[in-house]
Amino acid sequence: MKRHAILATIGSLVLAALTIHPAAAAQSPPAAPSLDFEYFKTRVQPIFAAKRPGHARCISCHIAGTPLRLQPFSSGGTTWNDDESRKNFEAMRRVVAPGNLKSRLLVHPLAEQAGGDFYHNGGKHWSSQNDPEWQILKAWVLGETKSGSE
């Protein structure tokens, strides 16, 4: 009987809280943005093949021997086909938390003084969050789409 009384009291308290603040019960956290494949394919993915002074291309290391694996170019190719792009997109989804600017894709290759972390054996490719390539990655993580909307 005592247990029943405790449960009834708890139920009454919950009901009272919902009555006092009904909007709080209906609110849920905002949904995280989704990652757009077309934006990835046309804006993000080319960054992985770009040459930067003093650094190897991302694809040089990330096709083998690292936890984050990109697809190699087809023999003689200089870019990825749709199937390879889809596989790269899926690999990148493992290092991106949509909507989170602390995603590994953003902080590992970013200089520590610019907000990056100490990880990334391939060096710090961007010294500032204002770098145009870093801004493209950020836009994608925040839900930018090829059509330009979020």
Show the residue positions of the predicted features.
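General helical structural elements
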Residues: 6-7, 142
